[in-house]
Design a protein with these regions (language model features):
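Secondary-structure junction/capping motif
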Residues: 8-17, 75-78, 281
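Charged (often Lys/Glu-rich) extended helix/loop segments that serve as interaction or gating elements
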Residues: 29, 34, 38, 43-343
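Gly/Pro-rich turn-and-neighbor structural signature
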Residues: 2, 13, 22, 34-35
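Alpha-helix-loop-beta-strand connector modules within alpha/beta enzyme cores
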Residues: 14-29
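Glycine-rich tight-turn/loop motif centered on a GG-T
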Residues: 2-15, 62-64
C-alpha cells in the first residue's frame, strides 16, 4: 500500500502488525495462566495477490474534446446554445467562476428543452461539446482547490476514456463488487512522462465496467496518468496484485470467458514460460448457457441452404459464410486482431 489512511492501504508496518497480534495473544494467555501457543496465521490476499498480473491492450480512446475546431451554432439554434458559444468566444473577458455557473445552467436548459422536444439531439450534442471546451478553459484559469469545491469530480469527468480489451466482471470482479483498488501502469514507454489523465473502461455493455480508483503516490486518485496513443502502435497496461481469487470469482457477464494465461517460472534473474493456456472460445462459453456448437452450426447450414435455393446467395457465398461462422464460434470471446474469415 501507500501507507495512507485509505481503506485499500495500511499505515502501519508488517512488524507493527505482528507485534500487536502476538501481544494480544500473550496478554490473554498471561492473564489466564496459560502457556504461550504457537501462532499460525493465513493472510490470504497478502500471500497470493502478487503471483498474477493482468495484461490488457487499449483498443480505443475517447476524449471530451476532439481536435476539430468548435462549430458556431446556426442563427435559429436555441438561445442557450448561442449563449454557450458566446461564453466560449468571449471567455478571456469573463470571470471563470461566473462562467462556470452560467455554462452549467445553459447546458441544463438545453437538456430540458431536449426532453420537451424543443431541442434536437444535434443541439444537445453541440451543447455538450461547447460545455466541455469551456470547462477545459475554466480548469486552466481557476485554482484547483477552489474548483473542486465548486464542482467536485471535474477531473474525473474530463478524463480520457481508455477502452481496454477485457471484462471487469470476469477479470477484476473485486474492483466492481467491493471497490478493491488494484495498481495499474503501462508496461512500456516507461522512460516517457505520461501526458494524459484517464479512466479505464472495459468492452462490456455495462456502465459499471470501468476502473476509476487508482493507488498513486499521494493516495487514491480518480484518474490514471497515461500516454497519448501512437498511430499503429499497441499500448499495453499491467493490472497488478490480481492473484487473490480474481480468476476464480470472475463471472460470464456479457459472455466474456476466461482469458489467455501464461505460467511463468522464475529462477533468479532468469524466467521460463512453462505453459500457455488458451482462453475460452465463443463455443465453450455459449455451451454454458445451453447453446451448443453442433446445434448452432446445423441451424446455420439449413438457413444458408434455404437462402441458396431461393437464389439469394451463391453456393460459394454460402460456404464462405459458414466457414466464417464456424471460425467465429472457435474464436476468442475478446477482440482479436483479425476477424473470422478475413482474407
Amino acid at each position: 500500500g501507500n501507507i495512507s489512511g485509505s481503506n485499500s492501504s495500511v499505515d502501519y508496518s508488517l512488524q507493527e502488525y505482528a507485534n500487536d497480534v502476538v501481544m494480544a495473544l500473550k496478554n490473554v494467555c498471561d492473564e489466564s495462566g496459560l502457556p504461550h501457543p504457537h501462532i499460525i496465521s493465513e493472510s490470504g490476499r497478502a500471500l497470493v495477490a502478487h503471483h498474477a498480473v493482468m495484461i490488457v491492450d487499449v483498443v480505443d480512446i475517447t476524449r471530451r474534446i476532439n481536435d476539430t475546431a468548435p462549430k458556431e451554432p446556426d442563427a435559429d439554434s436555441p438561445v442557450q446554445l448561442r449563449q454557450l458559444w458566446d461564453t466560449l468566444s468571449e471567455f478571456d473577458a469573463l470571470q471563470a467562476r461566473e462562467a462556470l455557473h452560467d455554462v452549467t445552467a445553459y447546458r441544463e436548459d438545453i437538456n430540458k428543452l431536449f426532453v420537451l422536444g424543443h431541442a434536437t439531439l444535434s443541439d444537445r450534442a453541440h451543447a455538450d461539446d461547447l460545455y466541455w471546451r469551456i470547462i477545459s478553459k475554466i480548469m486552466t484559469a481557476m485554482d484547483e482547490s477552489e474548483l473542486s469545491q465548486l464542482e467536485p469530480g471535474l477531473n474525473s469527468k474530463m478524463a480520457d476514456r481508455y477502452f481496454c480489451n477485457f471484462s471487469v466482471f470476469q477479470s477484476l470482479p473485486d474492483s466492481w463488487a467491493i471497490n478493491q483498488v488494484f495498481p495499474v501502469m503501462p508496461i512500456h514507454r516507461l522512460n516517457e512522462e505520461p501526458d494524459r489523465q484517464a479512466i479505464l473502461v472495459d468492452i462490456t455493455c455495462d456502465s459499471d465496467g470501468k476502473i476509476e480508483d487508482f493507488p498513486l503516490q499521494n493516495g487514491i486518485s480518480p484518474t490514471l496518468p497515461l500516454h497519448t496513443e501512437r498511430s499503429g502502435e499497441s499500448y499495453l497496461l499491467g493490472i497488478f496484485l490480481t492473484g487473490a481469487y480474481q480468476e476464480i470469482l470472475g463471472d460470464l457477464h456479457n459472455l466474456f470467458g476466461d482469458t489467455h494465461a501464461v505460467h511463468v517460472r522464475m529462477d533468479g534473474d532468469h524466467y521460463e514460460l512453462e505453459q500457455v493456456v488458451a482462453g475460452e472460445s465463443v463455443a465453450e462459453v455459449l455451451d454454458y448457457v445451453q447453446f451448443h456448437e453442433k446445434v448452432l452450426l446445423d441451424r446455420m447450414r439449413r438457413q444458408l441452404q434455404e437462402a441458396r435455393l431461393q437464389g439469394r446467395i451463391s453456393a460459394r457465398e454460402a460456404n464462405r459464410f459458414l466457414r466464417c461462422y464456424q471460425e467465429g464460434l472457435q474464436g476468442y470471446t475478446y477482440l482479436e486482431d483479425e476477424s473470422p474469415g478475413a482474407v
